[in-house]
Amino acid sequence: MDKDAIHHRQATPGPGGGFRREEVEEKLISLFTGEAGIARDRLDLTAPISGYGLDSVSVASILAEAETWAGRRIDPDLLWKQPSIRALADHLSAPPSAEAPKPAAVGEGYDSLTGLLEFEARFRALDEAGLEDPFFRTFDGPSGATIVSQGRSLVNFASYNYLGLAGHEEVKRAVRDAVDRYGASVSASRLSSGEREIHGRLESVLARFVGAEEALVFVGGHATNVSVIGHLCSPQDLIVYDSLMHNSAVTGARLSGARCLAFPHNDTEALDALLNRERRNHRSALVLVEGVYSTEGDLPDLKELVRLKRKHEAWLMVDEAHSIGVLGRTGRGIAEHFAVPASEIDILMGTLSKSLASCGGYVAGARRLIRYLRYTCPGFIFSAGISPANTAAALRAIEIVEAEPSRVEDLRVNAATFARMALASGLDIGRSAHSGVVPVIVGGDMQAMRLSNELFAAGINVQPLVSPAVEPGRARLRFFLSSLHTDEHLGQAVRLTADRVFARPALGR
């Protein structure tokens, strides 16, 4: 069978008005091998497609193309069950229902949104399992080692206030002073009349802190990745990213129009092979990794990544959202941790919302690149400047980190202590190492949500992380550690978690 023909033409109608199953399966195989760059011998046609190491955006893109090609939608309830290629082929080749579809009534047009239907299917499953929604709970007060909800104090492991600065008195004082001087908002793009002296000070301090020539601050971390990556790359370029890369970076990559390929998590041999195959066909190549992976709590091999980017003449961009203020003896991030000059990383991206007690994002790098972004990046020039309050909070937080590096060491000790206690209790913490993120892997999505609810009732605030953010069967409770946690907090959390994990058989989805 001519695979190119299969790839580009509509499926052939089969008996009963459906599509030939063999053609549908071959089309799905071609999408996962061609569009996603997965070797054919890696495809187990009976395994869940979410187990191929692709991010959720890539999977959604492939399935959308399959729907367009087959001329029919995939049932959201099937997607919720994490289907295999074979199950998808059976579904798309089955004869359509004999019942003619009813015209959508006014106000019911949202039924055409597959994502909305899948979302609603998830909540139906939650209701059927008798589980309370663990998300969007309301809290009061600062996010410290403890937090208050409805008048009840809980030990808090659901906030990435790594260095305990979000409620620091000096940070709050700096915020008040900035609002008194500059107001609540700069009320304009910085390109026009929104620039304030404090913006330049923060960018200078940030650049010095991470070891770059210059830095540029955006209003949000997600928007930073989307805008910068989407702006720098184009259809002539190649973007390769770790399969666990954050949604913001993957979204920016997709919006750029570049050829986008994921490589298996932290597999530098696979990255090398991918670049060997693809690099020559593109004007430039961008490699995207995270300094600390927020789902796993593990690190990339920076030295090997630098070697590969030199070998293949590629750019290297590191998202330091969870590594700035965490890695390195003084919290300067992944370059300090690996003793690699920061200049070896072409684009250092980070957020202000975690260790730096604020809200916003930044990129740092060569002066020439940052100046170009300052004048041309849409997410910067067409957005209001970061608020004076957030600017002042981040600026004062960096000054405190520089003056008190012991906070970084306190975080490191707490994370190592928690990991050691968890392992001693028989809990599965996956690949977590050297970071402030320690997952406890518990199995099915429903198990993770049930455990989160039970721990909340017992006085521990920890959020579940479920598919498609993680592989099916590897849902987890994600513990964010802080320099403020005490040994008592850590011991209590591990004991209560282990008691509940081992109190019943693992639940399914």
Spell out what each predicted region is:
Residues 261, 265-318:
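Active-site phosphate-binding strand-loop segment of PLP-dependent enzymes
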Residues 409-419, 425-458, 469, 473-474, ...:
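Conserved PLP-binding catalytic core of the aspartate aminotransferase-like
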Residues 173, 177-220, 415:
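Conserved N-terminal alpha-helix of the aminotransferase class I/II PLP-enzyme fold
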Residues 114-184, 314:
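N-terminal "arm"/small-domain region of PLP-dependent enzymes with the aminotransferase-like
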Residues 228-247:
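Conserved PLP-anchoring active-site segment centered on the Schiff-base-forming lysine
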Residues 173-177, 181, 204, 208, ...:
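PLP-dependent enzyme catalytic core of the Aspartate aminotransferase-like
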Residues 312-315, 322, 327-434:
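Active-site C-terminal subdomain of aminotransferase-like
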Residues 1-109:
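Flexible, low-complexity inter-domain linkers and amphipathic docking helices that mediate domain-domain
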